[in-house]
Amino acid sequence: MELSGEYVGCDGEPQRLRVSCEASGDADPLQSLSAGVVRMKELVAEFFGTLVEQDAQGLAEDPDDALDGDDEDDAEDENNSGRTNSDGPSAKRPKPAS
């Protein structure tokens, strides 16, 4: 038995994480699976911790770039503050059939 996960970053490159959950001998398969889940959780935390550190270093190198990207969204949000949201379902209740 194996647990696997895949992360596709902004660059489009997939990163695979795999953990074997094989029960050895008389070991309970559920205990092996549980141990595999714990190992996978640790791998995921380590993997994303590394990505967060890399991202933080990128922001620390040029903090002005991080601030510049938000200006367009803020202006757009201000322009749309009085409009209704047309992306979701209608808030009106349907009329009951007579």
Swiss-Prot record:
UniProt keywords, alphabetically: Acetylation, Nucleus
Acidic residues composition-biased segments: 61-79
A Gene Ontology term for the protein's cellular component: cytosol
Disulfide bridge positions per record: none
A Pfam cross-reference name: DUF4611
Localisation per UniProt entry: Nucleus
TM region positions: none
Quaternary data: Component of the EKC/KEOPS complex composed of at least GON7, TP53RK, TPRKB, OSGEP and LAGE3; the whole complex dimerizes.
Function of the molecule: Component of the EKC/KEOPS complex that is required for the formation of a threonylcarbamoyl group on adenosine at position 37 (t(6)A37) in tRNAs that read codons beginning with adenine. The complex is probably involved in the transfer of the threonylcarbamoyl moiety of threonylcarbamoyl-AMP (TC-AMP) to the N6 group of A37. GON7 plays a supporting role to the catalytic subunit OSGEP in the complex.
The protein's name: EKC/KEOPS complex subunit GON7
Recorded name of the encoding gene: Gon7
